[in-house]
């Protein structure tokens, strides 16, 4: 479960920072 949600959070946070 967590293994599938971590990538999603990392993608969202990374997108905001890399914005």
Swiss-Prot record:
Chief location category: secreted
GO biological process: defense response; hemolysis in another organism
Flavoprotein is among the record's keywords: no
Keyword flag Secreted: yes
Arginine amide modifications at: 19
Domain of life the protein comes from: Eukaryota
Tissue: Expressed by the skin glands.
One GO CC term on file: extracellular region
Cellular compartments annotated: Secreted
Record keywords: Amidation, Amphibian defense peptide, Cytolysis, Hemolysis, Secreted
Functional summary from the UniProt entry: Has hemolytic activity against human erythrocytes. May have antimicrobial activity.
Annotated protein name in UniProt: Hylin-b2
Organism: Boana lundii
Source organism phylogeny: Eukaryota, Metazoa, Chordata, Craniata, Vertebrata
